[in-house]
From Swiss-Prot:
It is found in: Cytoplasm. HAMAP family: Pept_tRNA_hydro_arch. SUPFAM superfamilies: Peptidyl-tRNA hydrolase II (SSF102462). Keywords: Cytoplasm, Hydrolase. The keyword Cell division does not apply. The natural substrate for this enzyme may be peptidyl-tRNAs which drop off the ribosome during protein synthesis. InterPro entries: Pep_tRNA_hydro_II_dom_sf, Pept_tRNA_hydro_arch, PTH2. One of its GO terms (molecular function) is peptidyl-tRNA hydrolase activity. Its EC number is 3.1.1.29. This is Peptidyl-tRNA hydrolase. One of its GO terms (biological process) is translation.
Length: 116
């Protein structure tokens, strides 16, 4: 089974709408990266129902660590930075999207994180 993981910063205290928007950016960009780099995985994930899991980190440092680990392990991923139009300053790192990819592979990086 395939899934996509979206990681959001809990320390920023973003409103619900802002959280959803940042997570949506991460989901879409990460999917597009997967579709470009590994189209068979993207297609399989679409056919399986697009499973997603949303997790949280408590700092920018933690977010960067997860992003670094995903890159090192060769996952299609993205780091989202806010445009600064509403609640938080421009350039603030808010979210990471990873995959889709095999669930068991993603667990090695994200298994220690808690659900949002």
């Amino acid at each position: 089974m395939y899934k996509q993981v979206i990681i959001l910063r809990n320390d920023l205290k973003m409103g619900k709408g802002k959280l959803v928007a940042q997570g949506s950016h991460a989901s879409l960009i990460s999917f597009l990266n997967t579709q470009k780099n590994n189209p068979s995985v993207a297609k399989e994930w679409l056919n399986e129902g697009q499973k997603k899991v949303v997790l949280k980190v408590n700092s920018e440092k933690e977010l960067f660590e997860v992003f670094r680990d995903a890159n090192i392990d060769g996952f299609s991923c993205c780091l989202i930075r806010d445009a600064g139009h509403t609640q938080i300053p421009s350039g603030t790192a808010t979210a990471v999207g990873i995959g889709p990819d095999k669930e068991e592979k993603l667990e090695k990086i994200t298994g220690k994180l808690k659900l949002l």
